[in-house]
Amino acid sequence: SDVIARGRRFLGEKTFFLTGLDEHGQKVQQAAERDGRSAQAYCDELAAQWQSFAARLDLINDDFVRTTDERHKEVVRAVLNKLHDQGDLYKKGYKGFYSVKEETFLTDKDRNPDGTWASQWGEVVELLEENWYFKMGQHQQWLVDLIEANPSFVQPDYRRNEVLGFLKSETLEDLCITRPASRLSWGIPLPFDPEFVTYVWFDALTNYITVPAALGDPVVNNALKGYYHPASGIGNPASELWPADIHVIGKDIIKFHAVYWPIMLKAMGLPLPKQILAHGWWQKDGAKMSKSTGNVVDPIAVIDEWGVDAFRFYVVRELAIGPDGNWTDGGFQARYQSELANGLGNLINRSLNMLKKYRNGVVPARANDLEPDATKAVADFVAALKANELQDALVAIWSLVGRANQFVDQTRPFTLAKDPAKAAELDAVLYNLVESCRILAVLLTPFLPSSSVKILAQLGFEQTGSTVWDAKWGNLPAGHVVGEPLPLFPRKDQPKS
């Protein structure tokens, strides 16, 4: 999500990156009880830990919404009141089996062939209770038509087909949106029936419109008119945030986002997000990560040893959006050595060192030998970024890294430097290399932001907000003086196993 947001800013698009935490529900209440603390204190500590972790990852989200925030509760109450007044909610009794782990009612379709419950559901109990329901079933055909008419709405395509398969093969039942407060106290009480609290997913999904509503987004606030009043007022152009361009989610929660959420928005009178992009899970050495078996990756430990940009690089380079990714320590170390240290880092270091050694760090006149390669790399990079094909964007960058390193081997500037008659040739080689390094630094902005700034600083530029317009060949002026070359990705000749 951070790379996509940075990428959109890089392309010059107005961008607002929202993330946060859903904190209500039975699992949280039980975890807090086991910990001997209030649910709020428990959530406060986890939220602080998460935000600290986000900072270590170099994330630049514009806002962070917690479902325990009062601003969020106000929006949830407004939505519930509106749907209640419209007749979209009703109360009825229900007897069924309930997964405590997943906080959802189950049906016989969720059983194993032998009639038992799959381990994914955890503890399953039989409940007989009254709850409030949202009239979701009446929207089934509308949602099928919408997804079929808009192929890009759910991506990748096979996730879209999964959603359509579900909608076409099963009758969409009305959604239970409450839990009795006598059983679950940790939730947002229904404003019109305080004996119930809001179902965690109905509450959590609403967080997408919490910040737009609070900032005065006219679309959201017009839909909730009479039910919600933003403190900041309506009409500030900076508040025009809805509909969202993209929701980036995990594959395990696609049903909530591609089925429940669109229907909720339709009932509210709100437009839908333009795209729901579902990514896979990380495996470790080909197996599901598990704390109990020790088969996990500690991101902080990786960042401490290898640097945040090395971690960001491998995560994006190795995980295509859609299928599961497979983390291996050997794979991480191999990519670090070959692509970061020996590829990118070596190119930057030797290009600048040669310019310092042979021309006192002064950029010679423009030369264009590598311009076609750089122009193609930029075009491929931009196309991939627009399509959210982040792996392909990195491939485009490293195509220029490889070509520039090849150019050094072909032109042999260290040999040219020995012959005064070849000074013009050496000048051309040096310009091509240093300008390629500058363009690479610009393109790295969304992916390796810290390294991008470091490279630009070594090139003698104090630049932190690079955009696609900076990636034009020839923007490096003759006579410019570069800074001091420093190792970007120190080689680790004996990586730890």
List the predicted regions and their residue ranges.
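N-terminal, positively charged nucleic-acid-binding surface of large information/translation enzymes
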Residues: S1-Q155
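Structured secondary-structure scaffolds
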Residues: S1-T19, R71-A78, S119-K357, A393-I397
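Basic, alpha-helical terminal appendages of large translation-related enzymes
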Residues: F16, R37, K92-F97, R111, ...
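A glycine-rich phosphate-binding loop feature that marks nucleotide/adenosyl-phosphate handling sites
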Residues: H24, G96-E102, G280-W282, G331-F332, ...
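N-terminal alpha-helical segment
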Residues: H24, N295, D373-V378, S436
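Hydrophobic packing residues in well-ordered alpha-helices of helical domains and bundles
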Residues: C43, V76, Q337, A367, ...
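Structural signal for well-ordered, non-membrane alpha-helices
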Residues: Q51-A54, L80, H84, G345, ...
